[in-house]
Amino acid sequence: MQKMKKGSVIMKELSKRTETFTDSVIRRMTRIANEYGAINLSQGFPDFDPPQEILNRLSEVAHEDFNQYAITWGAQNFRDALAKKQSKYMNLDLDSNKNIVVTCGSTEAMMAAMMSVCDPSDKVIVFSPFYENYGADSILCGADPIYVPLHPPVFNFDKEELENAFK
């Protein structure tokens, strides 16, 4: 590493894989919306309070012994409840220890899904336009995103373009 004046150390450049990433388009649009007082339709900003029953229960459990991180894939009782609900809703036999994982949000869920199925140098079809994380998730998994355009006005894909993407 090179030295700067007064003994400072120059930090290593960021990795090559990060060179194609930019700031979040969604967050950039949020800043613009806020600047002009526009209504932000891009993120979940509810303009109402949670139901009182939920607030009351949260207040109760804050004083109980549930103040530690759950296991990585989610608390057992929560996964059991999700498996029971989704089994009924989806008409499937779901095992809470094999078929259910709890994440901090959709971004983590999508990344976990991509990391579960992608190996380095795999090809991943990404329809374009796309949610900004799809291409980045592929790259971070070591896969190569292959962009296939969706055509307005109904944003259908062209069958030949999709077939060519697999070649």
Regions found by a protein language model. Give the residues of each.
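Extreme N-terminal starter segment of soluble prokaryotic enzymes
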Residues: 12-15
